[in-house]
Amino acid sequence: MSNKYKDTLLIGKTDFDMRANLNQKEPKFEQFWQENQIYNKKLKLNENKKVFVLHDGPPYANGDLHIGHALNKTLKDFIIRFKNTTGYYAPFIMGWDTHGLPIESAVTKMGVDRKSMSSVAFRELCYKYALEQVSNQANQFNRLGMFTDYDTKYVTLTHDFEMSELRLFEKMYQKGLIYKDLKPIYWSPSSESALADSEIIYKDISSPSIYVGCDVINSDEFKNTQLIIWTTTPWTLPSNQLIAIGSKIKYSLIQVENSDKQFILASDLINQVSQNIGWENVKVIKEIDANKLVGLNYVHPLYDTKISKVVLGHHVTSESGSGLVHIASGFGEDDFLIAKQNNIKPFAPIDNQGKFTTQISDLDPQLVGMFYDDTNKIITKRLEENKKLLKLKFLTHSYPHDWRTKKPVIYRCTLQWFVNLAPVKNDILKNVDQINTHPKWAKKRLYQVLDERTDWTISRQRLWGVPIIAFYDQNDDLVLNEQILNYAINKIEEVGTNAWFSLDADEFLPEQYKNKSLKKEKDILDVWFDSGSSAIALSQKYPNLKLPYDMYLEGNDQYRGWFNASMINSTIYSNTSPYKQLVSHGMTTDEKGNKMSKSLGNGVDPIAFANDLGADILRLWVASTDFTDDQKIGKEIIKQISESYRKIRNTIRFILANLNDFNVKTDYQTKLSEVDMYSLFNLTSFKNKVIQAYQELNFSLVYTLVMNYVTKNLSAFYLDFIKDILYINSKNDLRRRQVQTVLYEQLYCLIDVLRPILVHTIEEVYQNLNDNNKVESVHLLDNKEQNFVYDKEFINKWDQVMILRDDVNKALEISRENKIINKGFEAVVNIKLDKEYDDLKNIKDLSQIFIVNSINFVDNIDNSFIKTNISSIKVEQKQGLKCQRCWQIFDNLIDDEICNHCNNVVKSLLETKCE
């Protein structure tokens, strides 16, 4: 282009930079939102609208956020922002889980000696540390662009929350659901505490697998015979009390070549056991009915002085092992029940740290003080020396681990507090039946987990948590009733939970129970009891937020965790589900599908990511994934997302630049050309689909729809052909103002559909928009009503135009390849329409819309025409002179420089300057 005419073109200008520099701009917007209370102002605007509550599951307040936190909160933020712009009052009250072992451990690692200080002093350090962690995580969530007020949050360590929890405990007690009993439960030596089922994860480990022979005694029928048992926990053998058999299982007495012993095992397992041990030439002497084995005495495989017997066991099968099961009542749930049925007291000589206690000293003093797992070698060696070890090998199998420490747990019989779920199980399952879930299979999964759940172990042997309110006399017998419990909780309401750990028991007892030397319970409530009470606590603090809440949204690891505990607590408290809809998302993995771990070095730090590429890129990644499945993230994926972001940003930048001189009050046009109307129809269709996708939580579809619309409907079509109108026509030209009107609507459409996702970028867009009607922040707006609807005949016609456009583009591409033309504006396009599309001849400005020099509709064609979808096309090169201003080719130019249209525009510019 000649420099002579460059300044006469209306090239749009905007301060909305091509380079995003998100890491520099985003913190400024976050500060702006917080300082100006944008979230609270939006809630105020929405206060009379329908309430929508997405109840935030509390992350644990320990350490920095990981990518899973970012995924979870960003998904919630999408929903909260969308609801607040589409007719709802949707508060986002974020929560934190702040009690329990990890915080105790973190404080201890800071050099604090828990045993050298009072319980209250240690608890105060935990309290201080937890609040510091909450503050740190809140700042990090703020960096990711969450729409919330960080001063309006719930934290499980606050007095009001703890009291809500204790009142729930009281209600459970009043309903007869709370009890204390000696039971085998999951015990974590690494945490030194009981664990609930929800706190268990499974990992593969290698364990010793041993077959052991136990000598039968006092039997004429089974002389010189051993009962075969099998176990992967040799350390439990010192505690063996019984051998259990199945009542419906057939057993056999066998003779093995080169052995002076006979053996008894399940008939169905002879081949498997023989193969595992390495026996050959096994002879079945006779089959034995199970009842004949009941009461049979045997010598303990480790201690000759200990005699035990064979009993029936409900859990014994002939699918694996030997069909005879070693029973140690202190280390297994079924073992405990069988021992109880046979009037045998539980025996569990293992302490809180997993070490053998002096309870074993009479039988085996060598084991006292040893860690249970370290005794396996000693025990198997003794069995071998005593000729009781038939086979030792190692097998890899799935084994329960502590979900926090990632170390193995054991079943251990201890006195614990429980919630009896049997009386409320049907109510719980009925409530599950009434909820909606996303994905659909989630309801069945939650139902199954709750249906199979046994009584809830709610006590923990820790210090940092909500105390269990109970008392004991000098004989350690429990002293508790409704009067005592209510009095104690009322006292704690006055003085706080720390007082439970510092004041005498009498301070919490009614008058008639004082001065009786009663002792307080030392255990605290399970942290799942804490977080599972959150919906109740929130409903009490904010009466306008009524149960059940509209939605819970957490990772798919919460079916056994928060989803589960919340449903139990809410059902017991108010016989209602805490949520109407339950939504779960998958876990984050690297690009190869591997779980993220420090050892693999494949983790993604969301804050480092935001401070490098920008939080909006991370948020766009979240939107792009199918969150119901596991989400992959890595360099290549982020590269693709960044490219998508650039396309969106550049499209918006073009629109902003070309609205720079547009005043919506004076320049907005209601009468538009047909192509403008068609563009607005596509806008409405697109926006409706996006809104539906948001409503269905299909954010990946939102992402796909946006990218298709930006690239195909806007960049490759409408924005492409209107450039000449915007740049070349005069400023106040009607056609130019019509196009700008469409751009104005397109921009607001993009603002609405992208506002929940690209929260910083859309704020930047809005701040750079030339609009006299602007409010303080884009996040105070509701979605703009954009209902551009036209009759079907009109839409069908323009759908056909778009097909013809594709035909022309195909012909142009072939012509470029054949060197007929270089650019589209050189092309003279001759078109023979198929008969049913003849009406397209009447469309105005097709050459401008198709960005070609001219279009001729013809009736006759020859072999040089190319057959396309609805037409036959021939492209020729326009011969003539190129206008130095608009670059279009004409037969004649004024002064051999510019076309007539450009000349008129330039003249009007000169006249305006002179005025």
From Swiss-Prot:
Protein name per its UniProtKB record: Isoleucine--tRNA ligase
Gene Ontology molecular functions: aminoacyl-tRNA deacylase activity; ATP binding; isoleucine-tRNA ligase activity; tRNA binding; zinc ion binding
HAMAP family: Ile_tRNA_synth_type1 (MF_02002)
Residues annotated for Zn(2+) binding in this entry: 883, 886, 899, 902
Domain topic, free-text comment: IleRS has two distinct active sites: one for aminoacylation and one for editing. The misactivated valine is translocated from the active site to the editing site, which sterically excludes the correctly activated isoleucine. The single editing site contains two valyl binding pockets, one specific for each substrate (Val-AMP or Val-tRNA(Ile)).
PANTHER family tied to this protein: ISOLEUCINE--TRNA LIGASE, MITOCHONDRIAL (PTHR42765:SF1), SOLEUCYL-TRNA SYNTHETASE (PTHR42765)
Localization (cell): Cytoplasm
GO cellular-component term (any): cytosol
Enzyme class: ligase
Keyword Phosphoprotein: no
Keywords from the UniProt entry: Aminoacyl-tRNA synthetase, ATP-binding, Cytoplasm, Ligase, Metal-binding, Nucleotide-binding, Protein biosynthesis, Zinc
Residue numbers covered by motif 'HIGH' region: 59-69
Cofactor requirements of the protein: Zn(2+)
Native source organism of the sequence: Mycoplasma mycoides subsp. mycoides SC (strain CCUG 32753 / NCTC 10114 / PG1)
Lineage: Bacteria, Bacillati, Mycoplasmatota, Mollicutes, Mycoplasmataceae
Self-association and partners: Monomer.
Catalytic activity: tRNA(Ile) + L-isoleucine + ATP = L-isoleucyl-tRNA(Ile) + AMP + diphosphate
Gene: ileS
